[in-house]
C-alpha cells in the first residue's frame, strides 16, 4: 500500500482532513455567506471560507463556466506570499514568467525617430520579499483557487449561469438578507427565479456591479481621455529586450510597455493610441488589431516587429474610479471597527466592484485578491464565534483607504507613462524626463510589490505605542517572512510559510534564549490558549503559538522547552 499522509493514511494529502461534503448542484435556500462573482476577489474569499465545514458558503456567477482567457497577468510579490497560505505558490512560481529586471528606452538624440536603451534596473529591490514579481494568466490563478476549494471540506464550486437580481434586508430575521437569483438552464433557454436567504453577501461582480448599485453605492472618478491597446502576440523581432519587461518612450509615436508571458513564446504589449476628446468613447474609434500592430512598429523603430499570431487583444481608456465605502453601512457610521458601524454592515463589495485602475501598473487583480484575503478570514472568525461582528467594519476602513492610495499612484503613473519624453526638441512642461520616470518607477517599487500597505489603528491593529520593542516588525504592515531553522528536525524553511489560511490566530514569541520563555509560556497557556481553546481540541487549534530564538539550534534542548511550544 502507498501511504500519502502522516505515514499511515492512504489518501491524497491535498484533500481536507475532515470528511468532505459532496458539492450540491442545486442552490440552497439558506447560507451563511453568498459570494456573487467568481473573479479574483470572489475566489479568494471562497478559498478561505472553504476551509470551514461549519460555514455554509455559496458562490454564484452569471457566466456559463470558469474563466478561459484572463486579461490580468501580473502577480505582485505580496500576492505570491498570499498564495503560500493556500498551498499553491510553488505551482505558480513553476509556471510563471519571473520579472527579474526592467529596461527603459528613450528617444535617440543622435537619430531622429529611433529609440535607445537608457537604463536597466532590478524589478524588485533586494530584500523586499522572498517572492518574485511574476506573470501568469488570470485564468490559471483561478484554476488553482478552484482546485483548492474543491479539495476542502465543503467541496466548494461556483454555481454558474446564476445571475444576481436584487436583495432586501430584514434585521429581525436570523438570515437578514433575502437575495433573488435568476438561474439559467444548462441549454441556456429556460430561467428560474430562486430566493436565497443569507447572513452576509459579498459582491465581487466587477466594475458594473449590481450588488454595488443595490446598496446605493457608485464609482466616482474620471478618465484621462487617452486610448490604449493591449495584445498578446507571437512575434519575431530584433528588439534586444523582448524577453525583459521594457518601458519604451518614443519621441512622437507614443509609449509602450512590453511584458513577456509565461511559456517563453508570447509577449504582451501595452500600446499608446489616440487621444480622446472629452466625452468621446473608445468604441467610436473602431480600432483594430492591425492598428495596434502598426502603432507598436512605429514606437519600436528602428527595431522590427513581425507578428505571426495575435492570441488576444483589446482596447481601453485610462480611468480611475473609487467607491466611497465597501459595505452597506449607513452614512455617519464610524468605520474604525466599532460595534455601531458593524451593525449596519451585512453586504460588502470587493475587487472591481469597489475600485478600477489602469492595467499598466499591474495592480487590479492583486488588489482584488487582497480585498478578498482581508475580508474572508474576518467573516470566518465572526461566523465561528471567535470574534465580535464589529471587526467586519475594518474591511472597508482598511481597503478603501488603500484603494484611494493606489488610485492616486495609478493616476500619476499613467500620466507620466503617456507624457511625451523630454528631448532636445521637446522641452514643454507637460513632457517627462526619461531619467525622472525611471527614478519614479524605482521609488514606487515597494508600492507596486504590495508590501508597503500599512493599516491604521482599529479594533484589530494597535497604535504603535510599543513599536520600539520590535522595530523590525511594523505594526499594521504585513509580516515579513525570514529564513529560520526548525529545531525539531533541523529543516531550513521560511517562517511566514508555516501559516496557512486555516482560521487560526498566530502568536510569535521572539526571545534571546529558550530559558527566557518558561514563565511567559506558562502565563499565556493558562490565560490565553486554554481560555479560547474548546474542550478536547488541540492546544493550538485556535491560537498557534511559536517561538523564534537566537543562537545555534543545536544548543537548544527540546526537553527543556515549554510544552505549549512542542
Language-model regions, residue ranges each:
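Extreme N-terminal leader/targeting segments of oxidoreductases
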Residues: 1-33, 48-55, 174, 341-342
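Core beta-strand elements of the Rossmann-like FAD/NAD(P) dinucleotide-binding domain
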Residues: 29-31, 187-200, 204, 343
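Conserved mid-domain beta->alpha element of the FAD-binding
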Residues: 30, 38-47, 145, 203, ...
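Short hydrophobic core segments
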Residues: 34-36, 137, 195-206, 352
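Glycine-rich FAD pyrophosphate-binding loop
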Residues: 47-73
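Active-site-adjacent segment of FAD-dependent monooxygenases/related oxidoreductases
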Residues: 68-151, 155, 159, 168-171, ...
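Conserved FAD-binding catalytic core of PHBH/FMO-like flavoproteins
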Residues: 147, 151, 186-188, 200-319
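A conserved short coil-to-beta-strand element within the FAD-binding core of flavoproteins
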Residues: 160-177, 316
Amino acid at each position: 500500500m502507498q501511504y500519502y499522509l502522516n505515514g499511515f493514511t492512504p489518501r491524497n494529502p491535498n484533500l481536507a482532513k475532515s470528511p468532505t461534503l459532496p458539492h450540491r448542484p442545486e442552490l440552497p435556500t439558506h447560507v451563511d455567506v453568498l459570494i456573487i462573482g467568481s473573479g479574483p476577489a470572489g475566489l479568494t474569499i471562497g478559498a478561505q471560507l472553504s476551509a470551514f465545514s461549519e460555514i455554509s458558503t455559496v458562490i454564484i456567477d452569471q457566466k456559463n463556466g470558469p474563466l478561459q482567457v484572463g486579461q490580468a497577468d501580473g502577480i505582485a510579490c505580496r500576492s505570491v506570499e498570499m498564495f503560500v497560505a493556500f498551498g499553491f505558490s510553488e505551482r505558480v512560481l513553476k509556471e510563471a514568467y519571473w520579472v527579474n529586471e526592467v529596461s527603459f528606452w528613450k528617444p535617440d538624440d543622435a537619430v531622429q525617430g529611433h529609440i535607445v536603451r537608457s537604463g536597466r534596473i532590478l524589478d524588485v529591490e533586494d530584500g523586499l520579499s522572498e517572492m518574485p514579481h511574476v506573470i501568469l494568466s488570470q485564468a490559471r490563478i483561478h484554476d488553482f483557487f478552484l482546485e483548492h476549494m474543491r479539495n476542502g471540506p465543503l467541496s466548494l464550486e461556483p454555481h454558474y449561469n446564476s445571475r444576481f437580481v436584487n436583495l432586501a434586508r430584514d434585521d429581525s430575521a436570523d438570515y437578514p438578507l433575502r437575495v433573488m437569483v435568476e438561474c439559467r438552464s444548462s441549454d441556456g433557454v429556460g430561467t428560474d427565479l430562486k430566493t436565497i436567504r443569507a447572513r452576509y453577501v459579498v459582491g465581487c461582480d466587477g466594475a458594473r456591479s449590481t450588488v454595488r448599485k443595490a446598496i446605493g453605492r457608485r464609482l466616482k472618478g474620471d478618465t484621462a481621455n487617452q486610448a490604449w491597446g493591449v495584445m498578446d502576440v507571437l512575434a519575431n523581432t530584433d528588439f534586444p529586450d523582448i524577453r525583459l519587461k521594457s518601458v519604451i518612450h518614443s519621441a512622437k509615436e507614443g509609449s509602450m510597455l512590453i511584458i513577456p508571458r509565461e511559456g517563453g513564446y508570447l509577449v504582451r504589449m501595452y500600446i499608446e493610441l489616440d487621444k480622446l476628446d472629452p466625452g468621446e468613447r473608445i468604441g467610436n474609434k473602431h480600432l483594430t488589431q492591425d492598428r495596434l500592430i502598426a502603432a507598436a512598429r512605429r514606437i519600436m523603430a528602428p527595431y522590427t516587429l513581425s507578428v505571426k499570431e495575435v492570441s488576444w487583444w483589446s482596447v481601453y481608456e485610462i480611468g480611475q474610479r473609487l467607491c466611497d465605502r465597501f459595505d452597506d453601512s449607513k452614512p455617519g457610521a464610524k468605520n474604525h471597527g466599532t460595534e455601531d458601524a458593524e451593525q449596519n454592515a451585512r453586504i460588502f463589495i470587493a475587487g472591481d466592484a469597489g475600485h478600477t485602475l489602469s492595467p499598466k501598473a499591474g495592480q487590479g487583480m492583486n488588489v482584488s485578491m487582497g480585498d478578498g484575503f482581508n475580508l474572508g478570514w474576518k467573516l470566518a472568525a465572526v461566523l465561528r464565534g471567535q470574534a465580535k461582528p464589529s471587526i467586519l467594519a475594518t474591511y472597508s476602513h482598511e481597503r478603501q483607504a488603500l484603494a484611494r492610495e493606489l488610485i492616486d499612484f495609478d493616476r500619476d503613473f499613467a500620466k507620466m507613462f503617456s507624457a511625451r519624453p523630454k528631448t532636445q526638441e521637446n522641452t514643454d512642461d507637460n513632457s517627462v524626463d526619461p531619467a525622472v520616470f525611471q527614478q519614479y518607477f524605482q521609488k514606487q517599487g515597494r508600492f507596486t510589490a504590495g508590501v508597503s500597505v500599512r493599516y491604521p489603528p482599529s479594533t484589530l491593529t494597535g497604535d504603535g505605542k510599543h513599536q520600539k520593542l520590535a522595530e523590525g516588525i511594523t505594526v499594521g504592515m504585513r509580516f515579513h517572512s525570514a529564513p529560520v531553522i526548525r529545531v525539531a528536525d533541523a529543516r531550513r524553511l521560511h517562517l511566514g510559510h508555516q501559516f496557512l489560511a486555516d482560521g487560526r490566530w498566530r502568536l510569535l514569541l521572539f526571545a534571546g534564549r529558550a530559558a527566557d520563555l518558561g514563565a511567559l509560556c506558562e502565563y499565556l497557556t493558562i490565560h490565553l490558549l486554554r481560555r479560547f481553546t474548546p474542550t478536547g481540541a488541540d492546544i493550538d487549534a485556535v491560537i498557534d503559538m511559536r517561538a523564534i530564538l537566537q543562537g545555534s539550534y543545536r544548543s537548544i534542548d527540546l526537553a527543556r522547552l515549554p510544552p505549549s511550544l512542542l
